[in-house]
């Protein structure tokens, strides 16, 4: 449920996260144990995953499905319960704040020629392209179909890590995919909220959404800007080992401020990350390793819970038209719109094809789907189910094809990838 307003209200579009550990009738400990075990396995196999089709993201999704009611029934999680909504709320805020720090004004200017096309042309075309089959094949009305298009328009490079996470992949391709995925989460949010209010048929909600977005924008600029300017005073110096905690403190204060004032925390998070990276690149640089780890942890936790929500009962009622929407969104609509946006660009054909294919539906879509489910719109369950199967299909396809595509691009694995072999540099030869 939403933290403010009546049930189903859009007033305060954040997600309730209190007492989530006890959600699901005492299954919290089992869920945490499962997360720890899968995290240990995925870290231990991360070197192998970097070289093969093995996907750590897919591990968490599959593990969630196994422990959920569609598997062994070890956990029973409600999609609208505080566990799901709280974890999604914190995780998306963390991811957007971290992604925003990769989108400083200098970085945007440097890569804007390509990423601007992806965001300004491919993204709106993807929204509209998904809305068409959602209306004609899945039977959604136009506002709800456009809502689905907005929910599924963001991308997530975590499911294509062999492409965006390797230094030997062409920089312009990595930058294009990183900037696109870093910005489209935040850019999709206003469209999601507007179409959500329209689908509810309550025009008065549009004004409230506008106020929330405006407050989020204001806090996202003001709070990190004031802190960054204060840090320029000679008396305010941090020990090197603590410098990563400065941006984290900004994020925590911003998160609490947004929840207290009804500002939209997701837009605020992304804008704050970008503002901090623009005004204090050193602070953003020190925070990057910590931010990446926090983002990965929260994403993996959300994927585990999301996998537990995907049960046979939830997907068995989907029609052939519903499945067609998911398949078309991944195999046709995203690739076609991206290729169209990259026409007459300096990218070689192989890199354009890779950029077109790697538009995985990821974490932001999970949270936006939950927003639709909790908002009380007539087709909320239908929208969430469509989002769920599309994301699951995307994770399977994209996270298992990133390494083969990298090899097709003739990109050799870098020498510093972990192999499991022990170094003998300090030993005497036998």
What are these regions (language model features)?
Residues 2-430:
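Transmembrane helical cores of multi-pass secondary ion antiporters/exchangers
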């Amino acid at each position: 449920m939403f933290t403010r307003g009546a049930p189903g209200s859009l007033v305060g579009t954040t997600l309730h996260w209190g007492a989530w550990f006890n959600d699901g009738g005492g299954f919290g400990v089992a869920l945490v144990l499962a997360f720890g075990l899968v995290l240990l396995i995925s870290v231990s196999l991360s070197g192998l995953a970097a070289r093969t089709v093995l996907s750590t993201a897919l591990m968490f999704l599959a593990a969630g499905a196994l422990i959920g009611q569609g598997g062994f029934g070890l956990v029973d999680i409600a999609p609208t319960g505080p566990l799901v909504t709280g974890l999604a709320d914190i995780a998306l805020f963390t991811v957007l704040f971290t992604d925003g720090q990769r989108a400083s004004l200098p970085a945007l200017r440097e890569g804007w020629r390509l990423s601007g096309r992806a965001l300004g042309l491919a993204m709106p075309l993807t929204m509209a392209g998904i809305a068409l089959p959602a209306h004609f094949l899945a039977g959604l009305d136009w506002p709800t179909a456009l809502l689905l298009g907005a929910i599924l328009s963001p991308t997530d490079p975590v499911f294509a890590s062999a492409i965006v996470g390797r230094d030997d992949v062409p920089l312009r391709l990595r930058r294009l995919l990183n900037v696109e995925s870093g910005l489209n989460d935040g850019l999709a949010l206003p469209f999601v909220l507007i179409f959500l209010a329209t689908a509810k048929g309550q025009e008065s909600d549009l004004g409230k959404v506008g106020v929330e977005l405006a407050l989020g924008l204001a806090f996202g600029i003001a709070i990190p800007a004031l802190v960054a300017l204060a840090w320029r005073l000679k008396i305010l110096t941090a020990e090197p080992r603590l410098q990563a905690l400065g941006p984290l403190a900004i994020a925590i204060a911003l998160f609490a401020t947004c929840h207290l004032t009804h500002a939209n925390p997701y837009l605020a998070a992304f804008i704050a990350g970008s503002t901090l990276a623009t005004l204090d690149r050193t602070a953003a640089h020190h925070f990057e390793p910590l931010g990446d780890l926090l983002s990965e942890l929260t994403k993996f936790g959300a994927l585990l819970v999301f996998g537990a929500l995907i049960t046979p009962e939830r997907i068995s009622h989907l029609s052939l038209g519903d499945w067609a929407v998911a398949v078309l969104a991944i195999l046709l609509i995203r690739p076609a719109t991206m290729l169209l946006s990259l026409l007459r660009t300096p990218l070689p054909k192989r890199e354009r094809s890779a950029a077109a294919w790697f538009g995985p539906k990821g974490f932001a879509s999970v949270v936006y789907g939950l927003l639709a489910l909790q908002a009380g719109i007539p087709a909320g369950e239908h929208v969430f189910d469509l989002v769920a199967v599309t994301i699951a299909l995307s994770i399977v396809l994209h996270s298992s094809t990133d390494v083969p595509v990298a090899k097709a691009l003739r990109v050799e694995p870098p020498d510093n990838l972990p192999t499991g072999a022990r170094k003998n540099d300090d030993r005497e030869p036998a």
